[in-house]
Structures are given as structure tokens and as C-alpha cells.
Amino acid sequence: MSWLKRTTGRMRRGRVVAAGNRGVDDAVTAHLTDFARTRRGVEAYVEPQTSVTQVTLLLVAYDGEWTRRVVPSPQWAHAFAESLQIPGYDAAVVGYPQRMRDYNTRNKKHPDLR
């Protein structure tokens, strides 16, 4: 019960910021841009907000290497992908590419090859 009191108390005092009102940190934008520009075959997957996570943008390169960052909205994520001229997909609709799972499996079996 104390968690509920702490949470509602924060919301009343205005400390909690709605996800849509939050800007994007320059470091996040720089990281995503750098990832997309320094790797081949990058695709963007927009992950919807859930009860435990905010909207995220997942970038996956041709070899399965990936990076994920929190973004303000699905619209922002799609506009970002379009600005970099990379394809953008809704992850809830199309799922994740097999190459990403293969990349994770390779790195678990041989972490020294990263």
C-alpha cells in the first residue's frame, strides 16, 4: 500500500511527466543516428508502450546487431526512421527479425567474439 501512496503523491505534486510531453535527449538521437549511419541494412522497429516500458525504437543492422532506446511516441519513431531513409515497422505487427535472434544466440555462445 505504501507504493500506491508514493506513486499517487508524486502524480499530485506534478513530478511525473507524461511520456508524450517528454523531449528526446540529444544523446539518444545522436546514438540512434550514429548506429544507423555506421552500419549496413539498418531497419527500425517501433515497440509500443506497455504497462512496464515506454515506447522504444529498436534499430537492427543486417548482421543482427541491434540497439534500443526510449522515444517519446510512435509517430516520432517513424518520423525519425523516415528522416534517415530507413524502413520502419511496428514490432507488434511484424515481430522481430530472425537475424536479431541469431545475433543474440551467437553472442551468448561466443561472448569473446563481440
Protein language model features and the residues they cover:
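Intrinsic disorder
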Residues: M1-R114
